[in-house]
Structure formats: structure tokens, C-alpha cells
Curated annotation (Swiss-Prot):
Protein name, entry field: DNA (cytosine-5)-methyltransferase 1
Comp. bias (Acidic residues): 215-227
Known EC number: 2.1.1.37
Enzyme class: transferase
PANTHER family noted in UniProt: CYTOSINE-SPECIFIC METHYLTRANSFERASE, DNA (CYTOSINE-5)-METHYLTRANSFERASE 1
Length: 1537
């Protein structure tokens, strides 16, 4: 037993003296560092503030690695010695007493803190008799000490007893005797465990404190000099500019920016107000071994054997428990501490396993059970209860109720367990849901009774994301090997990204396990697809070879590309050798055919990455030439053939002698026969062509080949029938020697009874494959990917011998494209004037109004340029620590880059300049036009535009000359007071209609009455100029106004079946276009079906599985189980719908499993509906990615089915924002028309829109396809903005729930006037918004109102929430490798991953205004731009989703000025639904109905194109004039027809 040192000074409280004496006893087991740590921890509370500040600064320096540990320890010792010596040993001044100067308060306080909170632990630690405890202690200390503060705060428990530095030596007993000077020792003696030399000097009394302090001061100065030298050396090796940076950085790194200290064990912040200490055990509490032998816990009689084997542990329950670390800090047990071998203990009342009563009665009080070796969960079997348990060296304990002090910590644990339970059970049956849908489920689930929280929130989901994802991984591991993992569902991938979850942590390695995981039966998904025989054969038989080929390619690709991450714990463990995959491996004696990874080694990172790649479609499509001509690729090979003409020439035109027949190698060919041509590359198939003419001239024996296009060269690619050819407009002259042989190409016209043959058992093969027989049904447009009925053209008798359909069509197209002038008038001033010019088949006359490119002319009035973003001002980075992430100027949803709409002018003159030879230069046509001003072009700028009608113009007498090539189309402009109908009716009567009421004078900035020559369209001959008056008489006002007058034939509405109808957006648009009457709709989701019924009371709405209904119809049933009449064959004239694709959109390649999924998908069911009913028109609407799924295989198979049925078809991508809504929404559209109908074109855009959102081309098999749209850069009308959409709606608060309110004002914009319609007593419905949690509401309140604001503008402050609680400040605890420090020297990292290390669960923070997860993962995800973002008044909505969440995919969902998310009605308006449109269900049901719908204005634009095709066919058949595309409101009507 070592001798005791002199007692501490009387100024120290007695309890502290006792602790210091205990420490002296244990000195042989502690290193110098640990001794210093513990003594300083005990006395630090009594040191002066100045000394404490110096110590904090040293702490910060060592933590930032600016100070080595050796220098740090020396400086601390020197600092303390100097302070003691300065006072001549007067220890009293070192202590900061209470304000009244009484030391008693300090003593009481210390007693309370030491004994009250730690006292019980102290006794336990002093005993320290358990060998297992001490061994694990020493092994674990080294892992935690390196990353934590070296000197913890005063209340921390005793430091670890591992001799990390090894420099503490046991001094001889004789060296610790009381000093002979007789002076009372000070605190200095407490810190006198220096070197042996020092102690021997003390024994002799040779060194006084002052001298010692001076010596230490010198040592410290030496160390500082050494440190400065090192710094200087480092700086001098750098360039001059870098030296400055270094110096500045040193200056700015002030000690104030230090990281708060953490406990080395539980990793909690020592200055955290929520840090709690274990209050101690009662006196009667027993040790674990003693407690386990207590008879109250025995469940066996004396005669029974206790356990089956010695390996079995007894099981008990524990109630009123607390979990704490060695220092007495209450701490959670799920943050990775147990896994890192940190010793956690628990105390409580232990009860027998059969006792379900959580009260203390009948329990045995136990203390310091543990350390905990593992924790686990059981009872995950679909019931309400989920149990948690601990395993120690002696027993298993199932947790019942926590102690009062531990309850808040344990509540979080329970929350995460119930949260994961909700997620797993939700995803079993809903694999295709989005992140927003999962949030909806979580937020609407009521927590079990007895928990101390009343709702689940997004914050709690993100808080527990790591745990939840691990539960999902565990669930997947228990699944079948061929089941797609739940982990790669869209919502889980979004959660992983947002929360920065680390995948692949193995439960075997972690000391956490799911005990007896119960496998929950997974939902089998939708019913098996009902298919017609034709569709079935195409999908099941025809492509089996293709699938095998894809799988082979997949294997190759796997070997090359698909590498496991190699980092996660899953990748790093060996194969198990037991699972099916391992048993198939060669090394385990298997065949090696399956090539599957061990089931225990399935890399989750790889699975998630692949799923992410499949979902992304690159907006920036690589520049590729449009495949206009494939003839450049036809490299042909000449054959050595014997060629001789048969008969005499049938025609001769001097240079050429035309023949009807030729003999090639004893085979006779005639004009009109089809031949094969050998390709240069023998591995390629033969080229096929029709011989349209044969002749001989100076080039030799020639023929003209009209090429056929094989199906594999179309968009169908490998899915096409190998024997099917397509006509194309491509032809070529070539020598007869290229011909390989004669082939038979048969035209297969649609049968007479085509419409009624749907669903019959048909043979899939059209012709027998004899190697020389082919067939064709369609003509194919290679640029637009359009399959159409072959064109009919009869050759004239005089050119029959050389008539080529391709030449004729190409000549016609070229002829149309070339601009021409006609009807010459007068000549003068070196110009020739004309009455008319034509381009692209459109006539332009003097007096017509025309669209011109925006750059065609400018205005003399320079309007105020749109407000650019204000320049960035300096931001207080301590208050707004995330603002530095906003370095990009681009804001999603901004219209700053939106182009101007077309200029509008009225033609005054059409002329060509006369050349020197006296002839007009007709290749360069010019127009003299009068300019029209739009409201935004006047001095009033954009403000005038907002309130004005979108088709309002102002006349001006300004004239300008433009090139005819700048003309983009014709429009109608009339003087409003000359109309015989209202301006509203006129505007709704057709496309491209404008009006003006005033003239604008740019010089005086005034509005005037328009002059006579502007308004009097019928006044012929007035005004100057040659024939202009006459021209005006034939202006568009007159000739175009006459067109809409109804004639005898009215277009009937198409009887429509809307499958997957939702709430009816597609049908609503078609009704507005006047093209259809929806008689039947199918919608399985009840709330959406009810909404459809509310808006379409005459429609039969089926709320059944579409497969069941089709089966009923195909089996001859007339009604369903509810007695609703089913549509029969021949009833349906138009079929439309948007089948969900999520079931097979996950993986980008087909293999046998995903292929079978696609065969059972709703797309296949929808195609079977089309095949059975054979409607006149078919429309499939889907997400933009539909055209890219599975390397476009889904698109190809869809088109392949339609072509085989006999349909003309095409596809394209449209942007809803270009048709009159303030929202970006790209949609893939597949259109089909029955034989005999005209295949509709895609509608031309009506509005300009942000160019980034208008990239609508599609790349399939490395070929770029575009739709027929020509208005790619501009449009007739300006873009619709958020202000246009919703500025008139009354203000509401977060959580507003009044279903009907009044408007409180008139509509302010043109869009609002259209969308409100003409209600008799206007009522505003569904202007309601989600009630967000208190924390989310506080975040929304602190998002600034400036454009582009989002989470990065949140201040880092504490805020009192509406529920009475307060938020915390986000702590920045790590150095950010990528972004460095802030301008004030503050840290920017919130997790150890910022420094390049693995994530540490202990770094997670919650309840902060800045969500911790966003800076955590921001660097990897574009800084999460747009989350918690506000909409911009002059911008547009992101794609409206089914559930507006501030942290969801849609991003910007906050109102521009109000502190809430957008309301249901605002979302409905962003989709273009009229205010009269009814929705059904709760608020989330309504959001989902709106988010899933097709925007009615987009559907209307498509509907008008279909209507035009119906009218064109009727005109052809009857020869009579038909009413043109029907009365059409400018963008939308108020309600359904």
C-alpha cells in the first residue's frame, strides 16, 4: 500500500479530498495523462475563469491537431503550476466561490453533483473487482480516446485505466512523504506526479514552487518556439500568395470556434443540457450473480434441471430500467456503442419471465447489470408489440418499462422500432410507392398506446433512417433469392440518399440481432394479366430468343461493369457455402451455371446504384444526326452476273432507253418486281428494294430501286418481325449487276372485318419463311418514327414505265418547302411586288397577320429588363452556415431563361429585289410589315401582361422589313369592336386568335385609338401602297373568320373508354376539345373513382381490376358482379389511359424474371384491351421515362403489338408547360389510329417555356427521334407563371381545412378568368393544405421570401415551437474536407464522414432548424437544392407530385409568400384543372388524385389534333365541308362538357 500524500487544502470540499485520495491509491494503474485528466476534471470547476479559458483553447488546439499530445500535457502542467506559484501558494484565489463568498455553497454543489449523481457509481468503480469488466475496459478505451476530447468537462466520470502512453512509473513509497517545510500543501501537490527527478527534489525540499513555475514557463516557451519554427518552415516552402492565405487562416481560426467536448464513452456532448446522470441504485440492489440466484426469480422446483445445457442463458424481464456508461451518463444503447465495445450497464427491477406486470412488485432490485453484450428485437410478427432485449454474460433480459429518468431516451428507441415496423409492413404490399407516399403513411399512422409521443413525423423517419433501412435489409435477407429486394424500391432509395444511410452493416458483426425473425407473407402484386392471343404470342413466344440473348449480354456486362462496391461489410465477408447460390458454385462442387453471388454477399450499394441508374434519363441527350436517310449506310457489292434485256425498249428519251424486262443469270425481272441487293459486309442481311424503272445509258445497264426498310432498322429494332418490311421515302439509281436475286414482297392490307377480329386466335406469322418471301403493311417515317398506312398514288399513263412513289413524295415535300411568290402586282423602286407568297404549303397574302421569330425585329420602346437576381451580399456565416452552398445561379422553376413569344406583324407588302438582269430575285423574298406590340413590349413591361388577356395586342404604325424565312405561321388579328360576338367567344373559337382595341405610340408612351387602315378590314383601296387595300380585303380577318361557320356536317363525339382513369384529367381535356364522350372508365382506387363520378355523372365507372373486367368481356359476359353494363366489341371508338409501369421499371435490362413481370404488367393488359376492342383511336400516356425503360424495350414492344394489330402508330414526348400550365411535366405519348383513319400529329406548343425543360427528343438504339413539332424555340403566347395561376386565392394558414370558402376578390389574370369559369355563385373548394409538424412549420416560417430561397437560407438558431418545445442549434463538429472552413474559421462538417472517415451514428443530431441530414449528404446530391424551397411568383411549379413535402422529390412546394405548403386547389390549378372540378376524399387523397392526373390542357391539345383527323376523314369520305376543330376555349373551359 503506497503512503498517502499530504491532505489537500481545506478550501476543497471534503468529498473532493476523498476522491483525490482514492485517485492517489490507484496511481499505479494510471498513466501520467490519465492522472492529469482525472485530477483536472475534479478541480476544474474551482479554477478561475481565465485559467479555464486557456485550458479550453488548448483543448481546441489538440482537437484540431494543431498541438501534439506531448506539448499539450506539458502546457497544461506549466499553466497550472504558474498560476499556483503566482499566488505564492495561496490556493484560495484559484477557486471561484459563490457570489456571497461562502465556500459552503460550492461544497454542497459538489456533494450534489458528485455524490448525488455519481456517488453510487463511485463505490462500484472503487471496488472494480470484476475481471471481465476490467479486461474489456482496457481493450475498448483506445478505440474511443482518439476521437474524443482529451480532457472532459467536470461532471464526466472517471477516465479509462488503460496505460495508453506507458510513461507513468510507480514511484517508491518513500518519495511520497509530507513536505518537511511545514507549510500547508496547495493544489500544486495534487499535480506533482511529474518526473522521478522532480519528486526526489521535493523530498529534499530543494525546489520551491516559484522556481518550479519559472522552470516550467521556460519549458513552455521552448515548446512554443519549436512549434513556431515548425510552422515557419511549412509556410516558407509555399508560394507568396499561399503564405498570405495561411496567415489569414491562422488569424481567423479563433479559439471561439472550438468543438464542444464529448464524453469519451457515450459520445454525448458534455455541455448538452439534456445530458443526464444515473441517479444511483437503492441500498438493497444486488449484484448480477447474486440477483440471479434469488429465489423470487427461480421458475424451477428443486427436483427439476434448470437448463437443457450450460450454454443456455436464463431469461428474465427487467422493469424500471436505466442504461448508462461507466461515467454514469444515461445513454441510448442503439447508437453503435455496444458494437464498438463501449461498456454499457443497466439497473432496474428484474422479474421472472412469466410476469407481465411492469410495476416494481415482485421484482428483485439489481445494480450495474452487464456490461451489455448484445441487444435484440423480437415479436416482429405483425402484432402490435415489438420486444427489445439485452444479453449479458449471465442472462437474457426482456425490457418492460423504463425508469422515469430513462423514459425520454427509451421513447426514441420505441419510436424507431414502430417506425421500421410501419415501413416494412407498408412496403410488403406497396413496392412502387414514392418517398412522399411513405411519408403519408407514416404521418397518418397512430402510434400505439402508452408511448410518450402522439404522431410520427418526417423528422422522426430521417432520425431513424439508418435503423429502418437496416430492418429492410434484414427483411430482404429473409426473402427468396429471386425476389427483387425491397431496398431498391423508389421510396427506400430516396430515403437512403436523403438521410445518408450506410448500407451493408452486417448483423453478425454488429451486436444487434433480430431474434427469430418472422417472415411476413409478401403481397403477390396485381392479378395475372389478361391478354388476347395475339398479344400473348408476341410476348411469350416471339421473343424467347431475344431474352436469352439479352441474358447472355447481361452476363458479359456483369463481368465487365457490374462491380460490387467492395467497401461495405457485406462485400468483405466470405461466401457462406450453404445457400443455393454457393452450392451452385464450382468451388463448392456445383455446376457454376447460375452465376449468382452468395446470398450473404449481395451488395446493397450495387443494387441501389443500379436501380438509380435505371431511373435516371439524361436530359442532355447527346447530339446525334436525325436518321433522315439510311441510304448512306448501304454499301453494296457488285455480282458477276450475265445480264441481257428481254424485248425492245418501251420508251426512249434520247439519252436513256427504258425496258420492261431483264434476264439476270437465267432469272427474268420485270418493272415492279422486288429484288435483293448484296451488302458490302457479308455479315449483314440483304438489302431489299422494288424495281421501279430499268434503262440503259452511258453508265451501263441501270435500274431505279425504291428501298424497303427492314423492321430491325426502324424504331422497333430487334422486336420487329424478321419478315416484315416497311415502305420508306428512299430510292436510288444503280447498276443491275448489284442485284443478288428476285424476292417476293407481299402487301398485307387490313381485312374487311378488321375491327371485329380483335381477340380472336390468330396466327402470329403473316407469311411462311422460305428465305425469299417478305411482307409489308405500313409506310415508315424515319425522322418522326411514324408507322402509317402506305400512301396511295396512281401514276400517270405517260410516266408509268418510270414512276417511283418515293420520288413523287420527295418532290412534293421539296416543292412545299421552297418559298415562292405568286400573283405579281407592280414594280417600283427596284422591287417587284406580289399579292401572295407560299411556304410549307401555307399561303400568305397582303393583309394577313403572321408569326415571326423573336429576333425578326425589335421594338423602339425598350421595356425594363426582367429583374435579374440581386448580387450576392456578404452573409453572416455563423448565423447562416449553409448559405455557402448556394454558388449556382440556376434556380429550378425560374423563367429567367424563358424565350420571348413570337413577334406578330401584319403584312403590308410582299416583294423581291430586282437583279441587274432585270429579273426579280425570287430566292430572297421580303415582307414589309406593321408591328404589333404585346403588353410586355410597351413601357408598362411585365406588370401590364399579368392583368391583360394573353391574346391582347396593340396596333402600331411602326413598319419594318423582314425576311420571309422568319415567318413561322399565320394567325388572326382583329379589331375588338369590329367583332359581332364577344371577345371571349371569339378567342375560344379557334387557335391563333388575337385582338386589339388600342394602338400604341412608343414615342409618346401613350395608347391611342387605332387608325382606320388598321381597323377597317373591309375598306378596300384605302391608304397608300399597291394593292394593299385589296389585300386587306382578303385578310385573315375575312377569310379565316368565314371558316368556323358551321356547315351541314357535325363531328360526332367518339365513344371513349378511359382505363386507369384516375380522377379524370385525360377525359376532361378530351371533353374540352369536344372530341370524345367518356361512357366508361376503369379506376381501382376508390377515392379517384368517386372523383371521376362527381365530374362525369353519365359515365359508368368500374372500380375493379381491369384484368378481371377484360376476362369477363372476353368470356361473353354482359355485366359485372355489380350489374354494371360492360362495353362490348364495336362499342369503343377511343381507348385512352396511363397504365402504371412501376412493376418493371426497376431494372434496365430484361432477364427471364423481369421479363415475366413485364408480361404480367398493366401495359400488356392495356394493349390487350386495344386488341380486343379495336378502337378507332388509341392513346397511351406515361412518364417521360417510359420511352427509355429497359433500353427502350417497353416502348418497342408496345409499338410492335400495335403494328401487328394493324394500327398506324407513333410516339413522342410533350411538355405540359408548353400548353398553358405553370408546371414542368414531360409526358410520353403513344398515339395509334385504326386502318383508314388519319394518324394524328402531335400538337404544336402554344406557350413558350423554360428551354431546360423542353428537351423532348428521344434516343433509341443510338438513333435520335423527334416528334413533328416545329415550334421548338418559341410559341404564340408567353409562359404561364405561378402568379398567373394562384395570386387571386385568399390567404390561408398551415393546416387550413375549410373545404369551401369564398374567393374574396375578382380574378386578376387571364388564366384565372379561364380557370374560374362562369359560376353563378362562385365557391372556392379544396383550398386546404397539409398540417405540418411544429418543427417543419418553424422551418417554413424561417425560409426567406426572396426567389430561390430554400433550406440553405435557414438560420442556425434555437426557436420555440408551437407545441411548446424548443429546437436546438445544429453543431458543426468536424472539419469538412471538401468545403473547408467558413470565413469566420468555423467548422462545416456535421459527421465524421466529412473528414473522409465512416459515418458515426453518435454524430446524428435532431430537432434542429437546419435538418442535420441535408448538410450530412449535401455534397453528394447537388446540395439538395430546392428542398424547403419557395415557389417563385414569376416561375413555375416542379412536376406536381402526389404529396407535397418540403423534403420530397418535388422540392419547391412552399407558397411564395405564406408559411405553408401549396394547397390542393393550387396544385389542381398548376395541372390546369378548372376550379369547378371536384375532388374526393381526405387531403392526401386529393393531392394524390391531382398529382397522378394528366393536365387537362395537354389532353385538350391532343384531343384537338384527334378531332382534326376525324374531320379530315369525314371530308374525304363525304366530299362536303365539315366544321373544323371545334369551339375551343383559349386554354381550358370551366367545367366538363
Amino acid at each position: 500500500m503506497p503512503a498517502r500524500s499530504a491532505p489537500p487544502p481545506p478550501a476543497l470540499p471534503p468529498a473532493l479530498r476523498r476522491r483525490l485520495r482514492d485517485l492517489e491509491r490507484d496511481e499505479d494503474s494510471l498513466s501520467e495523462k490519465e492522472t492529469l485528466q482525472e485530477k483536472l476534471r475534479l478541480t476544474r470547476g474551482f479554477l478561475r475563469a481565465e485559467v479555464q479559458r486557456r485550458l479550453s483553447a488548448l483543448d481546441a488546439d489538440v482537437r484540431c491537431r494543431e498541438l501534439s499530445e506531448e506539448r499539450y500535457l506539458a502546457k497544461v502542467k506549466a499553466l497550472l503550476r504558474r498560476e499556483l506559484a503566482a499566488e505564492n501558494g495561496d490556493a484560495a484565489k484559484l477557486f471561484s466561490r459563490a457570489s456571497n463568498g461562502c465556500a459552503g455553497n460550492g461544497e454542497e454543489e459538489w456533494e450534489r453533483g458528485g455524490r448525488g449523481e455519481d456517488g453510487a457509481m463511485e463505490v462500484e468503480e472503487a471496488a472494480a473487482s470484476s475481471s471481465s469488466s476490467s479486461s474489456s475496459s482496457s481493450s475498448s478505451s483506445s478505440s474511443s480516446s482518439s476521437s474524443s476530447s482529451l480532457l472532459p468537462a467536470p461532471r464526466a466520470r472517471k477516465a479509462r485505466r488503460s496505460r495508453s502512453n506507458g510513461e507513468s512509473k510507480k514511484s517508491p513509497a518513500s518519495s511520497r512523504v509530507t513536505r518537511s517545510s511545514g507549510r500547508q500543501p496547495t493544489i500544486l501537490s495534487v499535480f506533482s506526479k511529474g518526473s522521478t527527478k522532480r519528486k526526489s527534489e521535493e523530498v529534499n525540499g530543494a525546489v520551491k514552487p516559484e522556481v518550479s513555475a519559472e522552470k516550467d514557463e521556460e519549458e513552455e516557451e521552448e515548446l512554443e518556439e519549436k512549434e513556431q519554427d515548425e510552422k515557419r518552415i511549412k509556410i516558407e516552402t509555399k508560394e507568396g500568395s499561399e503564405i498570405k492565405d495561411e496567415i489569414t487562416q491562422v488569424k481567423t481560426s479563433t479559439p471561439a470556434k472550438t468543438t464542444p467536448p464529448k464524453c469519451v464513452d457515450c459520445r454525448q456532448y458534455l455541455d448538452d443540457p439534456d445530458l443526464k446522470f444515473f441517479q444511483g441504485d437503492p441500498d438493497d440492489a444486488l449484484e448480477e450473480p447474486e440477483m440471479l440466484t434469488d429465489e423470487r426469480l427461480s421458475i424451477f422446483d428443486a427436483n427439476e434441471d434448470g437448463f437443457e445445457s450450460y450454454e443456455d442463458l436464463p431469461q428474465h424481464k427487467v422493469t424500471s430500467f436505466s442504461v448508462y456508461d461507466k461515467r454514469g451518463h444515461l445513454c441510448p444503447f442503439d447508437t453503435g456503442l455496444i458494437e464498438r465495445n463501449i461498456e454499457l450497464y443497466f439497473s432496474g427491477a428484474v422479474k421472472p419471465i412469466y410476469d407481465d406486470n411492469p410495476c416494481l412488485d415482485g421484482g428483485v432490485r439489481a445494480k450495474k447489470l452487464g456490461p451489455i453484450n448484445a441487444w435484440w428485437i423480437t415479436g416482429f410478427d405483425g402484432g402490435e408489440k415489438a420486444l427489445i432485449g439485452f444479453t449479458t454474460a449471465f442472462a437474457d433480459y426482456i425490457l418492460m418499462e423504463p425508469s422515469e429518468e430513462y423514459a425520454p431516451i427509451f421513447a426514441l428507441m420505441q419510436e424507431k422500432i414502430y417506425m421500421s415496423k410501419i415501413v416494412v409492413e407498408f412496403l410488403q404490399n406497396n413496392r412502387d410507392v414514392s418517398y412522399e407516399d411513405l411519408l403519408n403513411k407514416i404521418e397518418t399512422t397512430v402510434p400505439p398506446v402508452g408511448l410518450n409521443f402522439n404522431r410520427f413525423t418526417e423528422d422522426s423517419l430521417l432520425r431513424h433512417a439508418q435503423f429502418v433501412v437496416e430492418q429492410v435489409e434484414s427483411y430482404d435477407e429473409a426473402g427468396d433469392s429471386d425476389e427483387p429486394p425491397v431496398l431498391i424500391t423508389p421510396c427506400m432509395r430516396d430515403l437512403i440518399k436523403l438521410a445518408g444511410v450506410t448500407l451493408g452493416k452486417r448483423r453478425a458483426v454488429r451486436r444487434q440481432a433480430i431474434r427469430h425473425p418472422t417472415r411476413i407473407d409478401k403481397d403477390k402484386g396485381p392479378t395475372k394479366a389478361t391478354t388476347t392471343k395475339l398479344v400473348y404470342l408476341i410476348f411469350d413466344t416471339f421473343f424467347s430468343e431475344q431474352i436469352e440473348k439479352d441474358e447472355r449480354e447481361d452476363d458479359k456486362e456483369n463481368a465487365m461493369k457490374r462491380r460490387r462496391c467492395g467497401v461495405c461489410e457485406v462485400c468483405q465477408q466470405p461466401e457462406c457455402g450453404k445457400c443455393k447460390a454457393c452450392q451452385n458454385m464450382v468451388k463448392f462442387g456445383g455446376s457454376g451455371r447460375s452465376k449468382q453471388a452468395c446470398l450473404q454477399r449481395r451488395c446493397p450499394n450495387l443494387a441501389v446504384r443500379e436501380a438509380d441508374e435505371d431511373e435516371e434519363v439524361d436530359d442532355n441527350i447527346p447530339e446525334m444526326p436525325s436518321p433522315k436517310k439510311m441510304l448512306q449506310g448501304r454499301k453494296k457489292k457488285q455480282n458477276k452476273s450475265r445480264i441481257s434485256w428481254v424485248g425492245e425498249p418501251i420508251k426512249s428519251d434520247g439519252k436513256k432507253d427504258f425496258y420492261q424486262r431483264v434476264c439476270i443469270d437465267s432469272e427474268t425481272l420485270e418493272v415492279g418486281d422486288c429484288v435483293s441487293v448484296s451488302p458490302d459486309d457479308p455479315t449483314k442481311p440483304l438489302y431489299l428494294a422494288r424495281v421501279t424503272a430499268m434503262w440503259e445509258d452511258s453508265s451501263g445497264q441501270m435500274f431505279h430501286a425504291h428501298w424497303f426498310c427492314p423492321g430491325s432498322d426502324t424504331v422497333l429494332g430487334a422486336t420487329s418481325d424478321p419478315l416484315e418490311l416497311f415502305l420508306v421515302d428512299e430510292c436510288e439509281d444503280m447498276q443491275l449487276s448489284y442485284i443478288h436475286g428476285k424476292v417476293n414482297v407481299i402487301y398485307k392490307p387490313p381485312s374487311e372485318n378488321w375491327a371485329m377480329e380483335g381477340g380472336l386466335d390468330m396466327e402470329i406469322k403473316m407469311v411462311e419463311d422460305d428465305g425469299r418471301t417478305y411482307f409489308y403493311q405500313m409506310w415508315y417515317d424515319q425522322e418522326y418514327a411514324r408507322f402509317e398506312t402506305p400512301p396511295r398514288a396512281q401514276p400517270m399513263e405517260d410516266n408509268k414505265y418510270k414512276f417511283c412513289l418515293s420520288c413523287a413524295r420527295l418532290d412534293e415535300v421539296r416543292h412545299k418547302e421552297i418559298p415562292k411568290v405568286a400573283e405579281p402586282l407592280d414594280e417600283g423602286d427596284g422591287k417587284m411586288f406580289y399579292a401572295m407568297a407560299t411556304k410549307n404549303g401555307v399561303q400568305y397574302r397582303v393583309g394577313d397577320s403572321v408569326y415571326l421569330l423573336p429576333e425578326a425585329f425589335s421594338f423602339s420602346m425598350k421595356p425594363a429588363s426582367p429583374a435579374k437576381r440581386p448580387k450576392k451580399e456578404a452573409v453572416d456565416e455563423d448565423l447562416y452556415p449553409e448559405h455557402y452552398r448556394k454558388y449556382s445561379e440556376y434556380i429550378k422553376g425560374s423563367n429567367l431563361d424563358a424565350p420571348d413569344p413570337y413577334r406578330v406583324g401584319r403584312i403590308k407588302e410582299i416583294f423581291c429585289h430586282i437583279r441587274t438582269n432585270g429579273k426579280p430575285n425570287e430566292a430572297d423574298i421580303k415582307l414589309r410589315i406593321w408591328k404589333f406590340y404585346r403588353p410586355e413590349n410597351t413601357h408598362k413591361s411585365m406588370k401590364a401582361t399579368y392583368h391583360a388577356d394573353i391574346n391582347l395586342l396593340y396596333w402600331s404604325d411602326e413598319e419594318t422589313t423582314v425576311d420571309f424565312c422568319a415567318v413561322q405561321g399565320r394567325c388572326t388579328v382583329v379589331y375588338g369592336e369590329d367583332l359581332t360576338e364577344s371577345i371571349q367567344d371569339y378567342s375560344a373559337g379557334g387557335l391563333d386568335r388575337f385582338y386589339f382595341l388600342e394602338a400604341y405610340n412608343a414615342k409618346t408612351k401613350s395608347f391611342e385609338d387605332p387608325p382606320n387602315h388598321a381597323r377597317s378590314s373591309g375598306n378596300k383601296g384605302k391608304g397608300k401602297g399597291k394593292g394593299k387595300g385589296k389585300g386587306k380585303g382578303k385578310s385573315s380577318t375575312t377569310c379565316e373568320q368565314s371558316e368556323p361557320e358551321p356547315t351541314e356536317l357535325k363531328l360526332p363525339k367518339l365513344r371513349t373508354l378511359d382505363v386507369f382513369s384516375g380522377c379524370g384529367g385525360l377525359s376532361e381535356g378530351f371533353h374540352q376539345a369536344g372530341v370524345s364522350e367518356t361512357l366508361w372508365a376503369i379506376e381501382m382506387w376508390e377515392p379517384a373513382a368517386q372523383a371521376f363520378r362527381l365530374n362525369n355523372p353519365g359515365t359508368t365507372v368500374f372500380t375493379e381490376d381491369c384484368n378481371v373486367l377484360l376476362k369477363l368481356v372476353m368470356s361473353g359476359e354482359k355485366t359485372n358482379s355489380l350489374g354494371q353494363k360492360l362495353p362490348q366489341k364495336g362499342d369503343v371508338e377511343m381507348l385512352c389511359g396511363g397504365p402504371p409501369c412501376q412493376g418493371f421499371s426497376g431494372m434496365n435490362r430484361f432477364n427471364s424474371r423481369t421479363y415475366s413481370k413485364f408480361k404480367n404488367s398493366l401495359v400488356v393488359s392495356f394493349l390487350s384491351y386495344c386488341d380486343y376492342y379495336r378502337p378507332r383511336f388509341f392513346l397511351l400516356e406515361n412518364v417521360r421515362n417510359f420511352v427509355s425503360f429497359k433500353r427502350s424495350m417497353v416502348l418497342k414492344l408496345t409499338l410492335r403489338c400495335l403494328v401487328r394489330m394493324g394500327y398506324q402508330c407513333t410516339f413522342g414526348v410533350l411538355q405540359a408547360g408548353q400548353y398553358g400550365v405553370a408546371q414542368t411535366r414531360r409526358r410520353a405519348i403513344v398515339l395509334a389510329a385504326a386502318p383508314g383513319e388519319k394518324l394524328p400529329m402531335f400538337p404544336e406548343p402554344l406557350h413558350v417555356f423554360a428551354p431546360r425543360a423542353c428537351q423532348l427528343s428521344v434516343v433509341v438504339d443510338d438513333k435520335k427521334f423527334v416528334s413533328n413539332i416545329t415550334r421548338t424555340y418559341s410559341g404564340p403566347f408567353r409562359t404561364i407563371t405561378v402568379r398567373d395561376t394562384m395570386s387571386d386565392l385568399p390567404e390561408i394558414r398551415n393546416g387550413a381545412s375549410a373545404l369551401e370558402i369564398s374567393y374574396n376578390g375578382e380574378p386578376q389574370s387571364w388564366f384565372q378568368r379561364q380557370i374560374r369559369g362562369s359560376q353563378y355563385q362562385p365557391i372556392l373548394r379544396d383550398h386546404i393544405c397539409k398540417d405540418m409538424s411544429a418543427l417543419v412549420a418553424a422551418r417554413m416560417r424561417h425560409i426567406p421570401l426572396a426567389p430561390g430561397s430554400d433550406w440553405r437560407d435557414l438560420p442556425n438558431i434555437e426557436v420555440r415551437l408551437s407545441d411548446g418545445t424548443s429546437t436546438r442549434k445544429l453543431r458543426y463538429t468536424h472539419h469538412e474536407k471538401k468545403n473547408g472552413r467558413s470565413s469566420s474559421g468555423a467548422l462545416r462538417g456535421v459527421c465524421s464522414c466529412a473528414e473522409g472517415k465512416p459515418c458515426d451514428p453518435a454524430d446524428r443530431q435532431f430537432n434542429t432548424l437546419i435538418p442535420w441530414c441535408l448538410p450530412h449528404t449535401g455534397n453528394r446530391h447537388n446540395h439538395w437544392a430546392g428542398l424547403y424551397g419557395r415557389l417563385e411568383w414569376d416561375g413555375f411549379f416542379s412536376t406536381t407530385v402526389t404529396n407535397p413535402e418540403p423534403m420530397g422529390k418535388q422540392g419547391r412546394v412552399l407558397h411564395p409568400e405564406q408559411h405553408r405548403v401549396v394547397s390542393v386547389r393550387e396544385c389542381a390549378r398548376s395541372q390546369g384543372f378548372p376550379d369547378t372540378y371536384r375532388l374526393f376524399g381526405n387531403i392526401l387523397d386529393k393531392h394524390r388524385q391531382v398529382g397522378n392526373a394528366v393536365p387537362p390542357p395537354l389532353a385538350k391539345a391532343i384531343g384537338l389534333e384527334i378531332r382534326a383527323c376525324v374531320g379530315a376523314r369525314m371530308r374525304e369520305e363525304s366530299g362536303a365541308a365539315v366544321a373544323p376543330p371545334a369551339p375551343e376555349k383559349m386554354e381550358m373551359t370551366a367545367a366538363a362538357d
